[in-house]
Regions:
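Topology signature of small-to-medium multi-pass alpha-helical membrane proteins
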Residues: 1-173
Length: 173
């Protein structure tokens, strides 16, 4: 039986992203003093507004929804890895598709919640640039989802299904 090399590669890349997501949800902190010190000499920037937006962004990244999603998605990847090692490639493929849809849901949530945070800017130019940046990131995430999903489904549908062997269990003479 051929190994699903594409799934191994996708799981490795997704594991890196999932570890970064766990780090962002559980370990990252907002340091107001450091941000204030780095923006001290900047001209044309409302430092208090930037700190407010940065604080709300940090709160969004470390919210309970982010933590639960990070744990669930990491658990899905662990399950995919376990089933790949058990040579249950079809089940691993289904679980990975579930992981992909959970990333799509989380990215949609992050985009919609981020739009609310961007509204905290009083300057329309900052709001527009922030909204455009978030939209660009969301589009990139959708494109990556489409690529990963398309390749996974293509190889899943292309391979022959695992059929139980009747030769071993046969009692006919």
């Amino acid at each position: 039986m051929k190994r699903p090399i594409h799934l191994y590669i996708f799981v490795i890349l997704s594991s890196i992203a999932s570890i970064l997501r766990l780090f962002s949800a559980f370990v990252s902190t907002f340091n107001e003093e450091q941000l204030r010190a780095s923006m001290q000499g900047a001209a044309g920037i409302n430092v208090e507004e930037l700190i407010l937006v940065s604080r709300e962004t940090a709160n969004l990244q470390t919210s309970m929804i982010q933590k639960i999603a990070a744990i669930v998605m990491f658990g899905l990847l662990i399950a995919v890895i376990v089933f790949l090692f058990m040579k249950k490639n079809e089940l691993a493929s289904y679980l990975y598709i579930g992981y992909l849809f959970s990333t799509l849901l989380l990215n949609t949530y992050n985009y919609l919640a981020g739009k609310g945070v961007a509204q905290l800017y009083s300057d329309a130019a900052f709001r527009d640039v922030t909204a455009a940046t978030m939209l660009g990131g969301y589009i990139i995430n959708i494109v990556l989802f489409a690529i990963y999903f398309g390749v996974t489904v293509f190889f899943h549908l292309r391979k022959p299904k695992e059929q139980p062997s009747t030769a071993i269990n046969s009692t006919d003479i």
